[in-house]
């Protein structure tokens, strides 16, 4: 853990930060083995490097999806994005106001999803307990559409995802309506959910469909069929990746 901080941060601030880091390490069974602390002219910079190992036969990559595999996601999607929209709205509303607190009542779940995401270690443990080995997997950080297209490109496949099966929390739906945003777009392209996207052989359908916290949302197809979203009324739309790409050049 390497940290650069300015004079406006107190020793107590650093104690609180490391208390949170230690709590996360305990939760995920991780040891802090080193780091560096230095001064910064402005602001705060935190750089964390994580190193681990795994049995070779248990490592799952992006490139293993096969035709007819089932596409699965953990948790629900779009909540982190709506949490961000909520925070940005309150920032604008309260700009210049003093002694006024933002009203987040009833929206705590959305804020938690944006501000305190958690790695889905529990899903990995459930899959292992059920003896299910995914054929491909990655986390959903840049949006479901973007990650699906990554898996399909790496695996040389296409996919079909069904709108009616995409898991969305009630609070996410309410906020999308309040912001006049398309709910499916929020779920497909919002990003920062940090849920797991993975594929499993169709032979595991019965086992995975009964697992709490996992939703079957589609299947893998031949590459020539491309990647598409099937809407509730049966229309087919090509998937568009609108997720963040740090290597893309601005035009």
Language-model segments: residues:
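Polyanion-binding loop/helix "lid" in catalytic or ligand-binding cores
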Residues: 101-148
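Short, well-ordered alpha-helical segments in soluble proteins
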Residues: 25, 55, 75-81, 88-91, ...
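Internal, well-ordered alpha-helical segments in soluble enzyme and binding-protein domains
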Residues: 17, 44-47, 64-67, 73, ...
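Glycine-/charge-enriched secondary-structure boundary and capping motifs
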Residues: 8-33, 38-46, 51, 129, ...
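Short beta-strands and strand-loop turn motifs
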Residues: 1-3
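Phosphate/diphosphate-binding glycine-rich loops and adjacent basic-rich segments that engage nucleotide
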Residues: 56-115
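A generic local secondary-structure boundary/capping motif
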Residues: 22, 35-39, 56-64, 74, ...
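Hydrophobic side chains in well-ordered alpha-helices
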Residues: 59, 83, 123, 147, ...
